């Protein structure tokens, strides 16, 4: 079973109306199709193929990570618009230097998947390549994906990186 936001739904509304904003899906035994388990049909996110491919990768690698969080943190996404930050580990080092918690919550740093069409198999494949080395992957000009053993672990990585990005933005604006 998987719980994902619905197509066109926003995470900020899940708390107040979960069953109107989320889709619960059951994958068939042979993995060839899924059923939506809900009183009201909510079509799953268009990024479902990426999420499922990431889960398949994690299971195949025997990783303990069971949760995939994908969100669109404004300051982190903004940083991916700067080509210099897209080079290997540049963004990680900048964000680690902002507050000590960033290295504590995200010790591997973050990988970068170059721009691809959201929901595409190519984007999923690029993300999986990065997950060999990182637990957080930025999707250039789109969002972030984090994996964790539980929801809190995955969320905390993105939240802490977002805080560091906001601090970086504020520090730069001060001159």
Please tell me what each predicted stretch does.
Residues 1-175:
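Glycine-rich flexible loops
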């Amino acid at each position: 079973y998987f719980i994902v936001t619905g197509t066109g739904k926003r995470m900020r509304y899940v708390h107040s109306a979960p069953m109107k904003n989320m889709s619960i899906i059951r994958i068939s035994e042979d993995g060839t199709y899924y059923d939506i388990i809900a009183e009201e049909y909510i079509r799953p996110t268009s990024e479902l193929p990426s999420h499922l491919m990431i889960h398949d990768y994690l299971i195949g690698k025997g990783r303990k990570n069971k949760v995939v969080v994908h969100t669109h943190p404004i300051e982190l996404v903004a940083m991916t618009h700067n080509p210099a930050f897209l080079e290997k580990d540049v963004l990680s080092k900048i964000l680690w230097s902002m507050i000590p918690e960033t290295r504590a919550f995200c010790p591997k740093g973050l990988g970068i998947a170059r721009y691809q069409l959201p929901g595409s198999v190519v984007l999923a494949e690029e993300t999986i390549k990065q997950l060999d080395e990182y637990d957080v992957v930025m999707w250039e000009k789109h969002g972030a994906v984090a994996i964790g053993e539980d929801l809190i672990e995955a969320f905390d990585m993105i939240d802490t990186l977002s805080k560091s990005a906001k601090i970086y933005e504020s520090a730069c604006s001060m001159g």
